[in-house]
Amino acid sequence: MMWRRISAVLCVVALFAVFTATASAVKYVALGDSYSSGTGTRTFYEPTCQRSVYAYPYLLHNAHPEWTFVNATCAGAKTGDVLNTQVTSVTSDTTWVTYTIGGNDAGFSSVITECAQPSWASNCEGAINTAQSYITNTLPGRLDLVNNAIKSRAPSAKVIVLDYPRLLNGTDCNALTFFSGSEMTRLNQTADMLKNVESAAATRAGANFVFRDVIPPFIGHAVCDGGGGSSTEWINGLSNPTGESYHPKVTGHASGYYPVVKGVTG
């Protein structure tokens, strides 16, 4: 009789252990472009894709080291890269997914490069018009493909969709750039357009998709806020190497992106 009681207790303990392990098994997959990989932080543990320990995905990983973490982010990524390469990291046991995507599809870095030149040497307005047309007419369908691919691979995963900050504050403090006030206004309006399109796509994707806007926390911390290169800036201005330009700094991830993500995941 005693042996049976001991066996029963051991079985209960074993079942509890299995249940606890299953319940606590969390997998987090980070997808997306340079705003998720950490370009702009200037320190990369994986240089090809410019993945940084200071980027918000790695900060979330540090907060939950018990989670399985897969970082599939890569600088320069477009929606096609997510669909063809990155999304394979999302499996049926995935709990959380985060991403920023769409800026490269719209050619936003090329737009910034064009607009940074003197007006007589560039066609900033034309570049912005082309980007905005893409955002309005083509990007929604591309985002739907990304979201559907994630859903098909991990129907139960919670997906946090993030946008991009407004980069400019209306003042050009960099000696080698030539943004006009109207150009900066339109560039920031383009970030707002991206936000609206990404938010709508997340809504279409269903209840497991949550859109979070990073524009509010970055207000007051754009390029040239506090003067070029100041600690008030959370975004790099024109930088060396130039690929780091107009991307969130370490503080941009720690104080801008990460709190927004952490507010959802806990």
What are these model-derived regions, one by one?
Residues 1-25:
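Secretory targeting and sorting signals
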Residues 17-29, 82-99, 144-156, 261-265:
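Short amphipathic alpha-helices and their capping/turn segments at secondary-structure boundaries
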Residues 24-73, 88, 117-119:
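Serine-esterase "nucleophile elbow" of acetyl-processing enzymes
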Residues 27-38, 68-73, 95-100, 105-107, ...:
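Structural recognition of the beta-strand scaffold that forms the well-ordered cores
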Residues 39, 81-135, 166-168:
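Oxyanion-hole/transition-state-stabilizing segment in secreted/luminal serine hydrolases
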Residues 46-54, 121-138, 182-192:
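A short acidic, glycine-rich active-site loop
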Residues 61-67, 141-160, 190-212:
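A structural motif corresponding to the C-terminal end of an alpha-helix
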Residues 165-266:
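Catalytic His-Asp segment of secreted/periplasmic serine-dependent ester chemistry enzymes
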